[in-house]
Amino acid sequence: MTYAAEDFDYEGLPIGSPMYAHLLAGAFSGILEHSVMYPVDAIKTRMQMLNGVSRSVSGNIVNSVIKISSTEGVYSLWRGISSVIMGAGPSHAIYFSVLEFFKSKINASPDRPLASALAGACAITISDAFMTPFDVIKQRMQLPSRKYKSALHCATTVFRNEGLGAFYISYPTCIAMSIPFTAIQVATYDTCMSFLNPNAVYDPTSHIISGGLSGAIASSLTTPLDVVKTLLQTRGSSSIPEVRKCKGSLDVVRFIYNYGGIPSFFKGIRPRMVVAMPATAVSWAAYEAGKEILIRVSKTSQA
């Protein structure tokens, strides 16, 4: 038995769908999102270091890719991706399943962007608790020092030298950044979808456009907090003594302001947006595609 696109509620899995359906769709989207633009994310991390590492890259993303590839090898742009893959799949599975749970509980919909934003904030708070240690390892691996042989070696070295707290020192900042980022992203996404896909039919183009726009807007507005997060997560590897002495977000904020004023809070904004637009578009499109596949499988099995 076949089904037309309009026979499926593309925006949601069937009522009563098992949690693993949301987990699988979320994991699929998370791995794709973080893998597609990983080299550009590595450039963004270096730009935000505010030391000699940041001078190894330029404001031009293409030139930075060419320079790093020629001096350090192409592989250096992908160092740490194993940590992202290990963390992104489960964390996005958690994020999307929690998002769908809260959206159903508070009746979030495209015409209620504030409810969607609240659901997104709840979801990211929980998923970031899982992802933050993996992000710390990723950013340490993205630096050119080569002091870590692998993601596992990085994790054990950081734990031995800096303790468990090093993996979570940036968590409050991550939440302070991720909640507005996700709230803006989800609200913008749902608002765009209400215009581009008002009938909620299977339309990947609308998911890609809405996802890209929501990612660009959310990433640009939250870049200052991302700079703070990067310095916190890499402080143990920083060549700047003042950074290594920072004990929390406020210390880092003061250092950044004294270092270069307001412009320093927007270091890496271009690569951050370049990463966020396609990554968010891929994330939403992959998640919605995963849901659509699971819906079809469910419908077929019930036929």
Curated annotation (Swiss-Prot):
Topology within the bilayer: Multi-pass membrane protein
Gene Ontology biological-process entries: iron import into the mitochondrion
Sorted UniProt keywords: Membrane, Mitochondrion, Mitochondrion inner membrane, Repeat, Transmembrane, Transmembrane helix, Transport
UniProt Solcar repeat ranges: 17-105, 111-195, 206-293
Main location as per UniProt: mitochondrion
Keyword flag Transport: yes
Compartment(s) where it occurs, according to its Swiss-Prot or TrEMBL record: Mitochondrion inner membrane
Disulfide bridge partners, by residue number: none
S-adenosyl-L-methionine keyword on record: no
GO terms for MF: ferrous iron transmembrane transporter activity
Segments passing through the bilayer: 12-32, 81-101, 117-137, 174-194, 208-228, 265-286
Superkingdom of this protein's organism: Eukaryota
GO CC, one annotated term: mitochondrial membrane
PROSITE patterns: SOLCAR
InterPro entries registered for this protein in UniProt: Mit_carrier, Mitochondrial_sb/sol_carrier, Mt_carrier_dom_sf
Family statement drawn from the similarity comment of this UniProt entry: Belongs to the mitochondrial carrier (TC 2.A.29) family.
Protein name: Uncharacterized mitochondrial carrier C8C9.12c
High-level lineage: Eukaryota, Fungi, Dikarya, Ascomycota, Taphrinomycotina
